[in-house]
Amino acid sequence: MQYNILMIEKVPRREVKEYFLLANAGKRFFKENLGKNELEDRYHERLGEFDNMDEKDLDEKFKDKTRLRRYNEMEWYGDNKRLNEMGSWPEMKGLPIEFTTGNVPETARMIDRFKREEIEVSKESLEKTRRCAKKLDSIIRHIDFVKPNFPLILFPGGEVREKDYNRHARKNELPLCKIFGYDIDDGSERAVSYSLAGLSDAPVYFGEYSAKD
């Protein structure tokens, strides 16, 4: 089954899990230098495999049990969201934290300035930042395939950037991440690539905690 996100609609939790696992599997597709038709075939093959699995079997594929708990505790919806409403994972792919304290377009601008040699990074971060920039360029080259087929997965703003990063950062006097409407759980690189390519929104799944009585 393939899902098309055209408007806000409630979606089953397992659908979000399938697409998280599919995005992880998809990283290998691009390492294999497949042509467009082969990419499509591999994509639908893996999606079909996940679609035919029981949800408990999908759950077993999640290595991060905190992520799985969050997926299970939230209600999920499909929509298109603006990139300026999202913050990436702090220090995504080893970037300096200063690159990821702002929203997605701000992170994209920092990457662009780095590529233009307008800003420098520490020796410890240099190689990781170069690798990240190359990966973003690769996503842009395949953007027509990636964007419609791999929705971003979003948590409520602060779920990662505040709870998992800022609380620790305050104690250690580190730079803090700004909090926006959504934190990206899966797809930070894709989102930044879209912004670098001049796009302003993306298809997403976003989670919300159920209102408590």
Model-identified regions with their sequence ranges:
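Basic- and aromatic-enriched surface patches that contact anionic nucleotides/nucleic acids
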Residues: 4-54, 58, 62, 170, ...
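Short alpha-helix boundary/capping and kink motifs at helix termini
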Residues: 32, 41, 46, 54-183, ...
